[in-house]
């Protein structure tokens, strides 16, 4: 069975450091080998939120799925694929309608059974919940930074902007 691996990190720091991407890649490649899956390609989105579907590698993966270039999408955890339940369900439906399966290497669910679908949806709900909690924790710090005159949104203010 031909498999596409999808890995993602949310922040530029994680993308530059590479640790999380490296861990995901190595784990998924070892998992695929252990269960006898042939890797078609690794799709990687660096420093892009899982709350958005506007991700270059994700779009390419979906295009290749429609072209039937692989049989299965393999992720480390479903929150690497999406942290928005509605988007997650739509993305997986899009894969399934193209004849492509979806599997997490670390979470046990089987979307061909009613119990498996329930577990999958619960895990998707937890991913969205965690994303919302992260936003709740980060927002007050960002407000405080603005009040102190610090630039928010990137490491440095855009060229020519003084803060």
Where are these regions (language model features)?
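Short, structured surface patches at the beginning of a domain
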Residues: 1-144
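Coupling/hinge elements of helicase-like and P-loop NTPase modules
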Residues: 132-163
């Amino acid at each position: 069975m031909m498999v596409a691996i999808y890995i993602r990190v949310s922040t530029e720091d994680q993308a530059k450091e590479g640790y999380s991407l490296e861990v995901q890649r190595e784990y998924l490649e070892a998992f695929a080998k252990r269960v006898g899956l042939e890797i078609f390609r690794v799709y990687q989105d660096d420093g892009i939120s899982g709350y958005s579907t506007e991700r270059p590698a994700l779009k390419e993966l979906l295009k290749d799925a429609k072209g039937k270039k692989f049989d299965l999408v393999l992720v480390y955890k479903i929150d690497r694929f999406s942290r928005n339940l509605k988007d997650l369900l739509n993305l997986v439906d899009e894969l399934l309608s193209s004849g492509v399966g979806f599997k997490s290497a670390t979470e046990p669910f089987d979307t061909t059974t009613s119990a498996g679908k329930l577990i999958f949806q619960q895990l998707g709900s937890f991913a969205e919940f965690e994303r919302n909690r992260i936003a709740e924790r980060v927002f007050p710090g960002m407000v405080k930074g603005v009040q102190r005159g610090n630039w928010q949104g990137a490491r440095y203010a855009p060229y020519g902007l003084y803060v």
